[in-house]
């Protein structure tokens, strides 16, 4: 059964589609109460509106910090329409109940992300908005609450259909509590960072499910992918292919991180989150792909390929002849994309360059490990900061190969040994329980190419 909308409170920061919503409410005979600039926008559009300060008899003060924090507002939001005592109490005080609350919050997360000052950020902490949202969500048996512009189409449908159903109001309330939880978490995290540069004493994160996956690492495991507060591989645009699997995502993330470690055109080929080959080449990603594939062509079959430059036809042609699970790059030439899309088995992702999250999380039984992300340009990573402690003086090409190997070995699971020549891996040993076996594995894969190569290890 739908509950009619007779009276609405509207106070929004984001004015997108405000006039459309106000017009629909007014046409349906809904009385609208509003605040400040929201009321002005509605009135300027010729939509009848009652200013909240006129209704409460209390003016907005302190630059708008206090405008809706008033018993006449919150009583109208919190009154249970099916509770005779509630209705008698507000009737005695000449307070009319609300059927609909439309609120969206000050953009706190966007403000701090823009580099705003501490004082500017403080002013973007919404107080009245969350209070009204939470009140309406608590009282969703009587009040429908709209907390985001993405819900406006649903609102318009409800206006035309005679109101919201109980199930719809419950879902809207659930969205509110998720929204305010994320809002408060952003504030708490920001204040904690402002207080200290150390790892936080308290840490939280809201994750939103992006999609369900067919299964997890194994067929008997359920799985889904969630997006957080930072962008990355989760936000990549899929241009072609079947839906991504759990293992596709883990390999794609590993490959993408591997190529972002390099400034020159780079390609990485991954299998089970380990590189089959990595290469950089000033001539472009086509040559880099060829060199990366030559490192271990057997393992590269069915792998995940990442490039840190636009994929052109010169790279697409050889890649299209080899079974590849996923290809990820910042962009694609039109002819290269057309060729690759003829392969039904390949998943093609377009991903914008993003800053790697400075914090890494790892679940453990009963808790979570948190550490700063292993950034490749940490102190000591640049060749200019190295000390040669033995052997003949190193020439420029050898130093270039060493820097490449050092940047590339970070993407190899420990114990890790990476052999390189001409800024391309020629043999990789990974995941062994002792470093000697990793070295043997790398040398065996390099074969005759091992002569004159350089080596990098992730430990002594």
Question: Model-found features: residue ranges?
Answer:
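ATP-dependent carboxylate/acyl-activation modules
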Residues: 2-10, 15, 100-103, 183-185, ...
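Short, hydrophobic/aliphatic alpha-helical segments
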Residues: 19-26, 106-125, 131, 255-264, ...
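Short hydrophobic/aromatic-enriched beta-strand-loop microsegments
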Residues: 30-33, 47-59, 101, 144-145, ...
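Glycine-rich nucleotide/cofactor/substrate-binding loop typically near the N-terminus or early
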Residues: 37-108
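Active-site/ligand-binding-proximal alpha/beta "capping" segment
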Residues: 81-127, 134-136, 387, 393-396
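Mobile "lid/hinge" segments at catalytic clefts and subdomain interfaces of large enzymes
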Residues: 132, 139-151, 155
């Amino acid at each position: 059964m739908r509950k009619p909308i007779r009276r609405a409170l509207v106070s929004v920061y984001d004015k997108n589609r405000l006039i459309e919503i106000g017009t629909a409410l007014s046409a349906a005979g809904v009385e609208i109460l509003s605040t400040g600039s929201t009321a002005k926008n509605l009135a300027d559009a010729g939509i009848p509106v009652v200013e909240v300060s006129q209704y409460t008899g209390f003016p907005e003060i302190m630059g708008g910090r206090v405008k809706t924090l008033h018993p006449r507002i919150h009583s109208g939001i919190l009154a249970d329409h099916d509770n005779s005592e509630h209705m008698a109490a507000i009737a005695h005080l000449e307070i009319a109940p609300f059927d609909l609350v439309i609120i969206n919050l000050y953009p706190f997360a966007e403000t701090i992300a823009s580099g705003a000052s501490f004082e500017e950020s403080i002013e973007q902490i919404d107080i009245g908005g969350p209070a009204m949202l939470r009140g309406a969500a608590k009282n969703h048996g009587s009040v429908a609450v709209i907390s985001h512009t993405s819900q406006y189409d649903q609102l318009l449908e409800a206006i035309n259909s005679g109101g919201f159903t109980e199930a719809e109001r419950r879902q809207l309330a659930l969205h509110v509590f998720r929204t305010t939880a994320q809002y408060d978490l952003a504030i708490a995290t920001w204040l904690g960072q402002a207080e200290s540069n150390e790892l936080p004493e308290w840490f939280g994160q809201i994750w939103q499910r992006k999609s369900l996956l067919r299964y997890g690492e194994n067929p008997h495991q359920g799985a889904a992918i969630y997006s957080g507060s930072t962008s990355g591989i989760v936000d990549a645009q899929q241009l072609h292919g079947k839906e991504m699997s759990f293992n596709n995502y883990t390999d794609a993330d590993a490959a993408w991180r591997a190529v972002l470690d390099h400034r020159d055109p780079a390609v990485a080929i991954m299998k089970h989150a380990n590189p089959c080959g990595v290469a950089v080449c000033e001539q472009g990603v086509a040559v880099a792909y060829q060199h990366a594939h030559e490192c271990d062509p057997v393992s590269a079959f069915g792998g995940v390929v990442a490039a840190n430059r636009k994929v052109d036809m010169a790279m697409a042609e050889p890649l299209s002849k080899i079974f590849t699970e996923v290809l990820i790059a910042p962009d694609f030439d039109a002819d290269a994309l057309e060729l690759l899309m003829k392969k039904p088995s390949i998943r093609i992702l377009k991903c914008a360059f993003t800053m790697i999250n400075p914090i890494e999380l790892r679940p453990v039984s009963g808790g979570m490990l948190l550490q700063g992300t292993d950034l490749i340009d940490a102190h000591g990573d640049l060749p200019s900061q190295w000390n040669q402690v033995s052997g003949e003086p190193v020439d420029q090409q050898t130093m270039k190969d060493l820097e490449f190997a050092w940047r590339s070995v970070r993407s190899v699971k420990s114990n890790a040994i990476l052999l390189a020549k001409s800024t391309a891996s020629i043999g990789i040993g990974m995941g062994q329980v002792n470093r000697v076996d990793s070295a043997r594995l790398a040398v065996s894969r390099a074969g005759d190419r091992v002569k004159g190569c350089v080596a990098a290890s992730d430990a002594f």
